[in-house]
Structure formats: C-alpha cells, structure tokens
Amino acid sequence: MKRVLAALVVALVAALLFYGYYSRSDQTWLLCLLASFPGLLYLVWQGMPRPSSETNRTLQRLGGTLIACFMLISVHLLYQQVVAAPAIRLKIGSQGTDNPISDPRRADAELRVRRGRIFAAGGQPIADTTVLPDGYVARSYPNSYTGYLAGYYSPLRFGNFGLENLYDDYLSGRKGNNPLLEAENNLLHRPTYGSDLYLTLQADVQEVAQDALAGCGGPQRGVCRGAVVVLDVQTGAVLAMASNPRFDPSQIAADPASDPKAERDRITAYWNGLVNDPSNPLVLRATAGRYPPGSTFKTVTLVAGLDTGKYTLTSPFTDPGQVSLNNQTVYDCTTCRPAGTGPRYSLVEGYKWSLNVVFATIANDLGAGEMAKYISSFYISRDLRADFDLATSSLCSTAAPTDIQCILSGPEAKNLNVASSYGQGQLQVTPLHMALIAATVGRGGELPRPYLVDHISQHPTSEGQPGRVLQKTSPQVLTRVMTPQTASTARQAMYTGVQSGWANGAAIPGWVVGGKTGTAETGRGTNHAWFIAIMGKDAGSPQYAICAMIENGGEGSSYAMPIAKRVMTYIAGRK
C-alpha cells in the first residue's frame, strides 16, 4: 500500500513541476513548486529508516525537512539557470519612463558579438560589422540606398527591426553555430561569430529605383512618397524594393567607441525626428504601405473573366461612359475614352483604355462568389508567407485582414464587388503584392512565393574559406491562379496596353513590355498613381515584374509609369 501511495505522490509532484514548467509563468511555477513541497517531504520521510526513539524521530524529521527544502531550492535554481535564463537575461526594468534598467553584462556581451553581415546579390555589403581595438563591435550600413532594407540594430535603445530582427538568431550566432564549438569559445573567451545573410536584391537596380523615386514629381509638394518593386517573374525573388522617404539605420546604431551620453543623445534626437516626421519614413511603403490599387486591379478582373470562359479579348461591351448597377452608377474616367470611340468596345480595348464600365459589368455578371474566388487565389486577404516583413493586402476594411465577407454578404456587398473590380471599394494592397500579381500573369498563371533571402552561411573560416551554407531558399509556387492559356491571353492584353493603350509610354526598343496604369481615388486629396508591368526578350516568358506607386501622385500614366520606365530602361541596358 505504501509503495502505491509513494508512486502516486511521485506522479503528483512530477505533474505539478511539469505544469509549472510549461506554463512559462514565474507565478505559476512558484505556486506549483510550493504545492509540490508536501509530497516531496512525504517521499523524503518515507525513505528514511525507522527511528529508535522519539528524539531520533524528531531529529530525523527535521533533517528530512531540511533535505526537502534543499531539493526544492535546487529544482528552482535549475529552473532559473537553465529554463528561465534567457528571459531573465533579457528582462528590462524601469525607474520611470526614461530610465530603463537591464543587465549590463548582457549589453556588454551583445556589443562584442561579431554580428553576421548582410550582402546584396552581387556581394555588396548592406549591413557590416567592424571590430574595434577594445573588442567591441560597431554595426554599419555602407550604402544608404540599401541599408534601410536591413532594418536597424539598436539592442540598447529601440531593439531590432526588419531583417535585423527576423534573422537575429542567425546574425547574433545563437543559431547556426556548432554548440560544442560555442561552448569552447565561451570557456576560452573567444568571440562569437554570427552567420551572414545573402539577399536576392540587386544593388544597382535598387539604386536606380531609389533615385527615380526621389525625383518623382507629381502635384504633391514636399517629400515624394512612394515605392518601386522589381521581382524575378520566374522565381519570385525580390530584385529591388525601394521606398521613399526612407531612414538611415546607421544613425540608430550606436558607436561603442564614442562617448555613451553623446551617442545616446544623438540617437534619441534622430529617432524622435523619425517618429515625428509627418511623411513617416519608418514605414517601408513597398511592403508595409497598403493602398487602393485603382485600375491596375483590373488585371485581376480580366483574369477572372477570361479564366471562367465567359469572356474573350474580343467580347463586345456597350459603354456609353456610365452604367447603373445595383442602384449605383459607375463612371469611366473623363480622359480614358479616346475621342471618336464608343460606345461599343471589346474587352481588350476596355483594358488598354481602362474603362471602369467594362470591368464593373464583368464583376456584376460573374457575381461576388466567383470574383472572391479569384481575388483570394491571388492571395489578397491571405498571408504570402514571405521571408521578410510584409503587410497582408486586404479586400475588406475590417479588423481582420483575412476577411472577404464584405463583397459576399451585407447591404453593400454587390456595390463593393463592383467597386473592387476596378480597384476601389475597400481594397488595400501593397506595391509588392501588385508586382506579384503582374508576375503571376507573366509566369503562366502560377503565383510564386516572394522571397528576399537567397541563403544563410556561417562566417568564413580563419583560413578565408567560405562558411557552410545553413539554409538555401528554393523558389516555391503558392498556387495556380489561372490556366496557362488564360495567362497567355492576359499577357497579350498587357502587351496591347503598351502597344496602343494608355501605357504606350512604357515601350522599350528590343524588349517586349506589357503594362497597366492605375489612378486610385483616395476619398481625400489627390489620387494615388500606379503602374504595373512585365518585361522580357520573349513575349511568352517575361523576366521581370515591376510596380511603381506614388502616394497622391495623380495620374498613373503621368507619374508612376515614368518612374517604372526609368527602372526598366536601366535593366534593359545592362550587360
């Protein structure tokens, strides 16, 4: 009977300790630890020999109690030193809003790590580490055109952001190194080396895109706000991802060789300037900016109409300039309809001249269910599973970006379905996502997963040999959106837009270019300017997908398309 009871007590004590351990709560752990003490005490007492006298019994129980207490303390110390050690090491207290308190040894150790570097596709450094004479290291970002894409590294002030945060375990050496070698290095006080990131980013294309954005013009005054994205159509690799305005991460990184107070004041002043800047330079518009896409989204509606088999490029439409659908009047833009044309148009004419009435008619005819299926298949309101920070494009303006019910049910559903067909309604899409939609058409109907990190490698050896590759990105297809035949037809519509439509200013000699302009109404102020394009040497196999977007830029053909044209011209001229 005693053995059965002892076994039950052991099981109870183990259950309490395991529950406290997996709760990851200090309070729960301590309560479970205290609750296990009576059982632990019982087991210790049961394991002792029977005393020969009452005095021995008292001494024995006192000794058993002390043993149980020491066992309890030992278990708690083991928990603190092994399980909770990382959390304790990173814990930050406060003596008021401006006086954070943390373990200085953690900060000291962090500033001595040979943090991994970040490189562009051609080997150009995006983020680098310099070892100072006293053993500390300084983080630097040599190229202002690409540095902000790494994010920022500020462990003592503002934390990490972007790639510096997402890949911190690799960059700091906590992941990817040989555990035995790390233990030896710690024992012998050798420095820890982080792993290096190699990106798909092409630094020269990024610089051209950034320069084009800096002088984007437009009716707005002050800082030009916008984004340019260039993707490899066949793989989904990000070749350029420019945003304007941008921040300088080197101004946030501390220099350990400088006076600590002066550095703190300098960094704080720069940070406060960023936070208070009305142009929001901390928002990377290529990936975090979400906007109504305007007529560029007619590409999605075009695909839906073609892929269902209900329409061809020659399908006729009657478009007198406006149409009433579901008690809502849809208008063509006043400058879209070329003089002397209409009211009969084919679908390809509606696309190249960006006629809202044509695409509203398609969406209304297909119905919200069919439209929602194609919009969702392009991963609108879905996670693209990118390997970098990327906002989720959304169909509905609800708290959950994955919600698509606004066009399926409710009093405004039919109207929102129609408005979404030409890129208005509640649609909010990132520039990168619009580039991906163009890439999907260019790739034959398959939606590629966008990625920025080509591979992660260990730090080179002391003999100068390249480090071991820890992780290599393989291109992935997220889904097939349309048939190859539909994709070929949609590409032809995009090519026609450049050959004889409003995108004719994007033509490049010797290259096959397809494009779609967009002018998105914002409901307040000037419209957003958009342009998406595909380009290649062969009409059947485009190589690049491009998106340019200018906040409050005005007409897409006047302000976004010239920026994309400048980037495409550079790409076409490279050897």
Language-model segments: which ranges?
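Periplasmic/cell-envelope proteins involved in peptidoglycan metabolism and beta-lactam response
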Residues: 1-266, 278-290, 312, 369-376, ...
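Beta-lactam-recognizing serine transpeptidase/beta-lactamase-like catalytic domain environment
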Residues: 3-5, 11-17, 234-295, 300-552, ...
